[in-house]
């Protein structure tokens, strides 16, 4: 399935039904009064967050959505039927912006959470409403009002508590595969992962925590280089970052610093997010080299460092234990209104 995390749509709420001009025409009532009914309300356009959608792919092909118009009023003071609302399903984690003003309209995080993005027009008043002492037989009614029209930008930000970050080929997909039942594509070359992968990792209590394998970031990612800016946004909702560093790389310390610089340049508090560092591919490097890298890294960061091998499953339990402790000690709410 193709991963689409941005889309722009156009929505049109329904027009209100027209009020009508009508008079009572009953036997034995020679001078019946006005009885024109009101028009029905136009349907609204409503977004609903659902769990079964993981991407905004559907909006690549369907971009125009219209709710039903209200029906015109009827005689005998009958109000016209309301137009049906147009319900649009989106994935949980979708942020909604006005495409013209960039104003944030809403953020749909919870399952079945709803948000009206275009209000249906009010129905027009029938001539029954214009009866007065001066005008006993009003010959006019009001038309229904137009429904709202808007251009909307949708932006999906993954709902994961832990984000796995690092340069391409650091072993992020291997790690999420080792920790969970997720089975991402894995190969020994950069940019194997072209979409974020989600996996549920079980705590000792049995509770599940969602981890996200964020596609490989590179220098200049905050400016859109590589897979860049589009995937940095998916880290925004996380509470904790697992930063993988490839021990077999030419300069692991520089690799670590590149990712830190990208987080800081992107802003929005990412550089302040708690981190746990995993020195990965322990099984492929001499122990003295690993010790030197660990010592050098500890000189520039106070974040906890673990020596692991995702493929050989070495050191993962200790790193996970630190992950659970970090999550338990930090607030569950992260500021995501950006």
From Swiss-Prot:
Its main location: cytoplasm. Keywords: Cytoplasm, GTP-binding, Hydrolase, Magnesium, Metal-binding, Nucleotide-binding. The keyword Ligase does not apply. Its EC number is 3.6.5.-. InterPro entries: G_OBG, GTP-bd, GTP-bd_Obg/CgtA, GTP1-OBG_CS, GTP1_OBG_dom, GTP1_OBG_dom_sf, OBG_GTPase, P-loop_NTPase. One of its GO terms (cellular component) is cytoplasm. One of its GO terms (molecular function) is magnesium ion binding. GTP binds at residues 166-173, 191-195, 213-216, 280-283, 309-311. Residues 160-328 form the OBG-type G domain. It is an enzyme of class 3 (hydrolase). Mg(2+) binds at residues 173, 193. One of its GO terms (biological process) is ribosome biogenesis. Its cofactor is Mg(2+). It is found in: Cytoplasm. Residues 1-159 form the Obg domain. An essential GTPase which binds GTP, GDP and possibly (p)ppGpp with moderate affinity, with high nucleotide exchange rates and a fairly low GTP hydrolysis rate. Plays a role in control of the cell cycle, stress response, ribosome biogenesis and in those bacteria that undergo differentiation, in morphogenesis control. PANTHER family: DEVELOPMENTALLY REGULATED GTP-BINDING PROTEIN-RELATED, MITOCHONDRIAL RIBOSOME-ASSOCIATED GTPASE 2. Monomer. Belongs to the TRAFAC class OBG-HflX-like GTPase superfamily. OBG GTPase family. This is GTPase Obg.
């Amino acid at each position: 399935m193709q991963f689409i995390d941005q889309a722009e749509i156009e929505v049109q709420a329904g027009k209100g039904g027209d009020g009508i001009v009508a008079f009572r025409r009953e036997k034995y009532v020679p001078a019946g009064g006005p009885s024109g009914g009101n028009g029905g309300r136009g349907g609204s356009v409503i977004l609903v967050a659902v769990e079964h959608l993981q991407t905004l792919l559907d909006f690549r092909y369907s971009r125009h959505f219209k709710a039903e118009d209200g029906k015109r009023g009827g005689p005998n003071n009958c109000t016209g039927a309301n137009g049906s609302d147009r319900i649009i399903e989106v994935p949980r984690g979708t942020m909604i912006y006005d495409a013209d003003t960039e104003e944030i309209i809403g953020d749909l995080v919870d399952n079945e959470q709803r948000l009206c993005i275009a209000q249906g027009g009010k129905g027009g008043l029938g001539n029954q409403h214009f009866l007065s002492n001066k005008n006993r037989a009003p010959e006019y009614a009001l038309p229904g009002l137009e429904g709202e029209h808007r251009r909307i930008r949708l932006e999906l930000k993954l709902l994961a508590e832990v984000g796995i970050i690092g340069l391409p080929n650091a072993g992020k997909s291997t790690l999420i595969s080792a920790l969970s039942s997720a089975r991402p594509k894995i190969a020994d070359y950069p940019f194997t992962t072209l979409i974020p992968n989600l996996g549920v990792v079980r705590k000792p209590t049995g509770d599940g925590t969602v981890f996200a394998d964020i596609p490989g970031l590179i220098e200049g990612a905050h400016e859109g280089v590589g897979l860049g800016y589009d995937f940095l946004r998916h880290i925004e909702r996380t509470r904790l970052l697992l930063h993988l560093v490839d021990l077999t790389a030419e300069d692991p310390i520089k690799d670590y610093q590149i990712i830190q610089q990208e987080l800081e340049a992107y802003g929005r508090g990412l550089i302040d997010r708690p981190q746990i560092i995993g020195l990965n591919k322990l099984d492929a490097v001499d122990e003295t080299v690993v010790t030197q890298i660990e010592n050098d890294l500890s000189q520039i960061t106070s974040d906890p460092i673990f020596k692991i091998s995702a493929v050989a499953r070495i050191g993962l339990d200790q790193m996970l234990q630190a992950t659970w402790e970090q999550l338990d000690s930090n607030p569950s709410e992260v500021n995501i209104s950006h």
